[in-house]
């Protein structure tokens, strides 16, 4: 959980920027968006399968593109 120490005389804007930077580094907002709605395990597996297929096709495309330049 991100937390910052606000020093005496430090303005709100700089403290807010520090806090926002920590939140961004910890990927809290991304995690919240991902968990906003419940995703059944079957949907999760389906998405992983699609992502894997895209990754393989992308690598194959890059390989063919590289070989055509030789």
Curated annotation (Swiss-Prot):
This is Small ribosomal subunit protein bS21. InterPro entries: Ribosomal_bS21, Ribosomal_bS21_sf. PANTHER family: MITOCHONDRIAL 28S RIBOSOMAL PROTEIN S21, SMALL RIBOSOMAL SUBUNIT PROTEIN BS21. The keyword Ribonucleoprotein applies. One of its GO terms (molecular function) is structural constituent of ribosome. The keyword Ribonucleoprotein applies. GO terms for cellular component: ribonucleoprotein complex; ribosome. It comes from Nautilia profundicola (strain ATCC BAA-1463 / DSM 18972 / AmH). Coiled coil: none annotated. One of its GO terms (biological process) is translation. Keywords: Ribonucleoprotein, Ribosomal protein. Belongs to the bacterial ribosomal protein bS21 family. Pfam families: Ribosomal_S21. It comes from the Bacteria.
């Amino acid at each position: 959980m991100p937390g910052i120490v606000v020093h005496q005389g430090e303005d709100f804007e700089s403290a807010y920027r520090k806090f926002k930077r920590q939140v961004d580094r910890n990927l809290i907002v991304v995690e919240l968006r991902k968990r906003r709605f419940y995703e059944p395990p079957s949907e999760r597996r389906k998405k992983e399968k699609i992502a894997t297929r895209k990754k393989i096709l992308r690598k194959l495309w890059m390989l063919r593109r590289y070989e055509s330049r030789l």
